[in-house]
Amino acid sequence: MIIEPVLGGGGCIPATKEYLVGIEEFCRKNNSLFILDEIVTGFRFRYGCIYNKMNLDPDIVTLGKIVGGGFPIGVICGKDEFMKYANTSTLSKSSRAYIGGGTFSANPLTMMAGNTTLSKLKNNGNMFYRKLNNLGTETRKMLDKKFDGRVITTGIGSLFMTHFLKDTIYEIKNATDAAKCNTKKLHDYHFHMIANDGIFFLPGKLGALSSVHTKSDITAMAKSTDGYLTGFKK
């Protein structure tokens, strides 16, 4: 079973620890692999993965994005008992798992960028992540206050997403709830910020803060939101 600890494209919704523990227990009882997709969450909120903090024990973990230092990358980590099937030096081709390879596999530039990024995060982790996560909390509070009950802002740490509510939706607990929200208004809101204030969002998607963002960026987003709300109220 493959699961994201925080839904990315599904609405930026963090799973509860109890839910993830339940999924892991289900996998153990049914002799299934418990696989965590931490491509978005790995090294996003802390130096490491979410599963470490939640005391989960996944069989396989996937990583990407941050561990590549801004360059394309995909990483598969796992327990020896499973990863041994990808070992080309000990198993014959017919006995091992297929691992695709190519010109850009283990690209030296990506490896250097990723290693440099992780080294900097390791050395400055506590201060860096505290600042970044606090900015995310401040952003979510600002958006909820500005829209005054007309949206729910989901997310965790430095990730956030604004959901424009419809009459039948009062909470966002899963991807089904998120899909029932007014995506047109979300697109309109994002296009407003892009066109009028140069604040870029991939329309209809989540927001992700980085180390270069400061409180002034949150202030700019708040000002742009005020401009959007002028027309929104009409």
Model-derived segments and spans:
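Conserved N-terminal phosphate-binding loop of PLP-dependent enzymes in the Aspartate aminotransferase
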Residues: I2-K234
